[in-house]
Amino acid sequence: MSKRLTPIHLPNSLNYPIEIASCLVPQGSYVKKGTPLLLYRFFTKVKEDQEDGSEVYVDREFVEQFECPVEGELVEWAVKKEESIENFSKIVAKLHEPCTHEVNYGGLCAICGKNITSQDYMGYSDMARANISMTHNTGDLTVSLEEASRLESENVKRLRQEKRLSLIVDLDQTIIHATVDPTVGEWMSDPGNVNYDVLRDVRSFNLQEGPSGYTSCYYIKFRPGLAQFLQKISELYELHIYTMGTKAYAKEVAKIIDPTGKLFQDRVLSRDDSGSLAQKSLRRLFPCDTSMVVVIDDRGDVWDWNPNLIKVVPYEFFVGIGDINSNFLAKSTPLPEQEQLIPLEIPKDEPDSVDEINEENEETPEYDSSNSSYAQDSSTIPEKTLLKDTFLQNREALEEQNKERVTALELQKSERPLAKQQNALLEDEGKPTPSHTLLHNRDHELERLEKVLKDIHAVYYEEENDISSRSGNHKHANVGLIIPKMKQKVLKGCRLLFSGVIPLGVDVLSSDIAKWAMSFGAEVVLDFSVPPTHLIAAKIRTEKVKKAVSMGNIKVVKLNWLTESLSQWKRLPESDYLLYPSYDLPDRNLSEHSYSSSSDDEQRISELNDRELDEIDWQAADQDVENALKDLSDDNDFDTGSISASQSQPEALEVNTPIKRKADLIQPSYNYDGEKRRKENDNHEGYDLLPNSSTKGEESAENENELDDLADIMEAELSKDTA
């Protein structure tokens, strides 16, 4: 067996180019660390004083010695006398070391026991040779690149023999959901509570939070089907836990989901040992070879959208709690809830709520985490700059964030958000029934995820067998290439435009939902200048929705068409997710008057919407108009409900329709044609929101007059408020 030799390089800090002046140690000699190995010369300009008192720069030759940075037998000189060396990449000698200190534990070589923390005057330290951490449960144990490569090669060989891959599993909102709200414990002990049945399989444990002795009771809900999922997938994958929770938290959760320790064993990595307080990296566990590693996580950003990642839909059982360990991470923006079509025609004699009648803006409001103050990414916890240094170098930062985390947990326990939400639900809906439960077991993500993981495993070993069958081929299949190839097929050819999905102030192409969609082959566009194939709409009344419907060749679908397609890794039929159940609207319903963004009437209404209709005092506006009309007519030509033309009437008030309230504002653009729909399809539940078909004749003219007059009144009111 040949000796493993250590190459010796000159420092990068030398004044290159240099010339070897002399080799001081004979080949075959044993040298100690710090022994002079060679002399080298170099030339540089120096300043010298002249006889006349002036100073000039002249070239001078200097000779220095280079000392051996390691201990061992000098097996081979790689340079000779008078040889010129241009940079530090040149190997000058090769030594055989008795110990290469490739495994470091707490500053000591784990092989020979030598202290390797010392550093010489050139900045060299044996600690730098073993700086790769690849174990799960401690950051104090590090290895060299060569040792890491050897260990991984052995692991890869074992997995291929077992026909398995490696699977990194996130905990919070991926396979479990956690809370410290004591309301859960009270509901679990009350058989009469409406949430009692869905809490039967919730587990709990007490955990001391840091050195303060503060204790929290955690309630853990398994994602439906978790036990079967882990058991089946463990036959195809070796399982690893990688969480941003604390080490104590990760161990307790691992005990609950794997009580025998058979599935995960000691392969549990927490943020305490991960080397980063805000990011996750495959290189932390697999520094040399990630070709057999798959990741499942509800957050793509913490992995920088690694090609080995399978992003799952976040599991939200405890409503509004979010990720209990996310205060270390950058804030994530939740997707908006899908706005539903209103099934009944609005009675004209009843006032409408703002949400029902006010046409929505194109984008969702800026995300305000204060609306979910019990989630760990809430405004009670300052957003942190991403920290990339190791835990050992950031103990103070870690301690500070742990204190903030404890503060957030205390807030969640004292505020009892689940109890507040359940009480609000019962107040809204009346007498408690099973349908009034706040918590629900309706998640099927693990079923879909199991199928995806099985498909990836099958494709990997199919490719691996194909490659190995070719003689002389030393390549192997790569999950990092297989997963993107499979994903790109799902939405290939789809150009997506979003409406009401991405909050204001968030760059569309940098948003999680856009990156997720693009990783599946979709193209994301910003407007209609590049015609989209799909409009993904979370809100039913936006300019983009109207324009897309009027164009006729764009599929206007709900947000869950996209999220479920991404979750299932297949393009689901759009017909099941159309924003309007009867999408193929007649051409007469898509008239320019109803939809065209260039329509003067619609433009004026849109402008008024942009100026916050909710701030208008409608009663005061009505009263002002009535007072103005009374002042203009001494003969009572006008009644209080409508205005008729008169020769003495100013041109600005020549209207012949009743004064409209805010509820009537959207009628020229949309109406609820429920009666007609019921006759067309008796089996159809609810009613469709249809464009107003009144585009010609007397009714159209009346509508146009209504819009003109209403716009004038509203603009006058806004001007008065502004003044």
Curated annotation (Swiss-Prot):
GO molecular function: metal ion binding; RNA polymerase II CTD heptapeptide repeat phosphatase activity
Stretches assigned to the BRCT domain: 486-579
Active site: 170, 172
Entry EC no(s): 3.1.3.16
Skewed-composition ranges (Acidic residues): 352-366, 700-715
Biological process annotations from GO: signaling
Residue intervals passing through the bilayer: none
Compartment annotation: Nucleus
Chain intervals with Low complexity compositional bias: 367-379
Segments of skewed composition (Basic and acidic residues): 673-687
Biased composition (Polar residues): 639-650
Swiss-Prot/TrEMBL keywords: Cobalt, Hydrolase, Magnesium, Manganese, Metal-binding, Nucleus, Protein phosphatase
Protein name as catalogued: RNA polymerase II subunit A C-terminal domain phosphatase
The organism of origin for this protein: Schizosaccharomyces pombe (strain 972 / ATCC 24843) (Fission yeast)
Source lineage: Eukaryota, Fungi, Dikarya, Ascomycota, Taphrinomycotina
